[in-house]
C-alpha cells in the first residue's frame, strides 16, 4: 500500500485549535499531515481479546449486551470470539453471528490449524459478512523458541491455512491473516513481509500487523508498518493490532493509520491481555481532533465505558483519558483562570475534548483546594447561582485557602464554600 504524497492529497489536517493566520505561517504549514483518503475501519476485539483476559469471562447474555452496545457505538467490525477454544465460545460466536446486521463484519479467531478454521467457519458462516481470522507467528524469536520449526515450514503453514480458509468462505466471506509478534520482527522484517505476501497470494483479504507485545517506541513500529506496506501491493488492506504494555498503544495505532493502516483493532475500555489493547475511545477522539472523519457515534462513549466497567468488574481509573471521573476537573489556580476565561470558546485553554461530544453529563469542573485562586471561587459560586463579583471572590479566596489547609489541604465542598461566602456577606 504505497502512500499518497502531500501534493497528491488535498485533504490536510484541519486543527480547530489553530487560527487561520497561524495556518498561513510557513513553519506551521510544513508540519501539517495529509489526511488519508480512507476512513478508519474499527474492528473491535473486546469480545475476544478483551474477554479472554477477564478473571471471569462473560457468559452469552453479557456478550450479547456488549455486542449490542458495539452496534450502538457504530464499529464496522466485531471479532465475536475464539470459536474453537471451547463450546461456550462456539455457541456465543454462532448466536452473535445470527443477529448481526448486514453492514458489520463478524470475525472469529483461529490458529493456523484446519480443524480450528473449520470450527470458526461453522460458527460464523450465517453472518451477513463473515470473516475467518487466522493468526500465526512471524518473528524470528517466536519461530525459533516457541514454534521450533524452520521459516520455510512457517510459510508453508500460512499458505495452507489461508488457502483452506478461503476455500470455505468463497465469495461469501473474507479471510484475515495476522502475523503474530510482527512488532518483534525487526531483525527478520523481510521474512515478515514475505509471510504477508504469501497470505495475500493464497486469498487473504486483510493482513494484520500486530504489536503483540509492546517493547519499543511508536516511531519504530510505524516505520516497520511503512516498510512492509511499501513491499505489498498498493491496494492491500492493512490492519493494526497493538497492545499497551508500555502505555503507547493509542499513539502507535493513530500514527499507523496515518502510515497507511486501514483497519484499526481496538477494545472498549482498553480491555485485553496484560496491560490491555488499544483503547477505542482514545483512538477515535485523537483522530477526530486531527480532522479525520471517524464513523463512530461519539455520544455513546461515556455510557459504553460505564457498561463495560460494570460487566467486566474492572473499575475505571479516575485519571483514565476521556472517561475517568476526574479528567474534567481543574484545581490549580493558573489552570482555573484559563478555564474560566475560555469556557465559552470551542477550544478551552485546558480542555482536550468536549465532554458533551462523548456523552458526559457535565463539562469542565472547577474544584477548590489550597492550590486554587479567586477564579475558582468566582466560577464555583457563580455556577451555583450566587451573585458574586471577582473582587469579592478575591477577598474570599484566602479565607477558603486557610480552611483547606487546616483541614489537611483537602478539597472544599460547595456547601463549605457557601457557608464562608454567607459569612463574608454578613461582614460586608
From Swiss-Prot:
Keyword check for Manganese: yes
GO biological process, one term: L-leucine biosynthetic process
Any matching Pfam family: IPMS_D2
Annotated Gene Ontology cellular component terms: cytoplasm
Cofactor list: Mn(2+)
UniProt induction comment: Expression is significantly repressed by leucine and moderately repressed by isoleucine.
InterPro entries, per the entry: 2-IPM_HCS-like (IPR050073), AIPM/Hcit_synth_CS (IPR002034), Aldolase_TIM (IPR013785), IPMS_Lepto (IPR054901), LeuA-like_post-cat (IPR054692), PYR_CT (IPR000891)
E.C. number(s) listed in UniProt: 2.3.3.13
Top EC class of this enzyme: transferase
A molecular function (GO) term: 2-isopropylmalate synthase activity
SUPFAM superfamilies: Aldolase
Keywords: Amino-acid biosynthesis, Branched-chain amino acid biosynthesis, Cytoplasm, Leucine biosynthesis, Manganese, Metal-binding, Transferase
Primary location group: cytoplasm
Subcellular location(s) per record: Cytoplasm
Pyruvate carboxyltransferase domain sequence ranges: 40-302
Pathway annotation from the record: Amino-acid biosynthesis; L-leucine biosynthesis; L-leucine from 3-methyl-2-oxobutanoate: step 1/4
Binding site for Mn(2+): 49, 241, 243, 277
Catalyzed chemical reaction(s): 3-methyl-2-oxobutanoate + acetyl-CoA + H2O = (2S)-2-isopropylmalate + CoA + H(+)
Protein's job: Catalyzes the condensation of the acetyl group of acetyl-CoA with 3-methyl-2-oxobutanoate (2-ketoisovalerate) to form 3-carboxy-3-hydroxy-4-methylpentanoate (2-isopropylmalate). Has high alpha-isopropylmalate synthase activity and low citramalate synthase activity.
Subunit structure as annotated in this protein's UniProt entry: Homodimer.
UniProt family annotation: Belongs to the alpha-IPM synthase/homocitrate synthase family. LeuA type 1 subfamily.
Miscellaneous information on this protein: Is missing the C-terminal regulatory domain compared to orthologs.
Protein name: 2-isopropylmalate synthase 2
Lineage: Bacteria, Pseudomonadati, Spirochaetota, Spirochaetia, Leptospirales
Gene that this polypeptide is encoded by: leuA2
Amino acid at each position: 500500500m504505497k502512500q499518497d504524497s502531500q501534493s497528491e492529497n488535498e485533504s490536510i489536517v484541519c486543527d480547530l485549535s489553530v487560527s487561520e493566520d497561524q495556518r498561513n505561517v510557513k513553519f506551521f504549514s510544513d508540519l501539517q499531515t495529509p489526511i488519508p483518503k480512507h476512513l478508519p475501519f474499527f474492528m473491535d476485539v473486546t469480545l475476544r481479546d478483551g474477554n479472554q483476559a477477564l478473571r471471569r469471562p462473560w457468559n452469552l447474555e453479557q456478550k450479547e449486551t456488549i455486542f449490542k452496545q458495539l452496534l450502538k457505538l457504530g464499529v464496522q467490525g466485531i471479532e465475536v470470539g475464539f470459536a474453537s477454544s471451547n463450546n461456550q465460545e462456539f455457541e456465543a460466536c454462532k448466536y452473535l453471528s445470527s443477529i448481526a446486521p448486514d453492514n458489520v463484519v463478524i470475525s472469529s479467531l483461529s490458529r493456523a490449524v484446519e480443524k480450528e478454521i473449520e470450527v470458526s467457519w461453522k460458527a460464523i458462516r450465517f453472518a451477513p459478512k463473515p470473516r475467518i481470522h487466522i493468526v500465526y507467528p512471524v518473528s524470528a524469536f517466536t519461530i525459533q523458541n516457541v514454534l521450533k520449526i524452520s521459516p520455510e515450514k512457517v510459510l508453508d503453514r500460512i499458505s495452507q491455512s489461508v488457502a483452506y480458509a478461503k476455500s470455505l468462505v468463497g465469495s461469501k466471506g473474507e479471510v484475515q491473516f495476522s502475523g503474530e509478534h510482527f512488532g518483534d520482527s525487526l531483525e527478520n522484517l523481510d521474512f515478515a513481509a514475505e509471510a504477508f505476501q504469501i497470505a495475500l497470494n493464497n486469498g487473504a483479504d486483510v493482513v494484520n500487523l500486530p504489536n503483540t507485545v509492546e517493547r519499543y517506541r511508536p516511531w519504530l513500529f510505524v516505520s516497520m508498518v511503512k516498510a512492509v506496506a511499501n513491499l505489498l501491493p498498493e491496494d492491500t488492506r492493512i490492519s493494526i493490532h497493538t497492545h499497551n504494555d508500555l502505555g503507547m498503544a493509542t499513539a502507535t495505532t493513530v500514527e499507523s493509520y496515518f502510515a497507511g493502516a486501514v483497519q484499526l483493532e481496538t477494545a472498549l475500555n482498553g480491555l485485553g491481555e496484560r496491560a490491555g489493547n488499544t483503547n477505542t475511545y482514545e483512538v477515535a477522539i485523537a483522530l477526530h481532533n486531527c480532522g479525520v472523519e471517524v464513523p463512530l457515534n461519539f455520544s455513546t462513549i461515556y455510557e459504553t465505558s460505564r457498561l463495560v466497567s460494570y460487566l467486566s468488574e474492572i473499575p475505571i481509573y479516575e485519571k483514565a483519558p476521556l472517561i475517568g471521573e476526574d479528567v474534567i476537573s481543574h484545581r490549580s489556580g493558573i489552570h482555573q483562570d484559563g478555564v474560566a476565561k475560555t469556557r465559552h470558546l470551542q477550544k478551552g485553554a485546558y480542555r482536550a475534548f468536549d465532554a458533551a461530544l462523548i456523552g458526559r453529563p457535565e463539562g469542565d469542573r472547577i474544584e477548590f483546594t489550597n492550590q486554587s485562586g479567586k477564579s475558582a471561587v468566582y466560577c464555583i459560586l457563580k455556577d451555583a447561582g450566587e451573585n458574586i463579583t471577582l473582587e469579592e471572590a478575591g477577598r474570599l479566596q484566602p479565607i477558603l485557602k486557610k480552611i483547606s489547609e487546616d483541614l489537611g489541604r483537602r478539597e472544599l465542598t460547595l456547601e463549605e464554600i457557601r457557608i464562608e461566602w454567607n459569612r463574608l456577606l454578613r461582614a460586608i
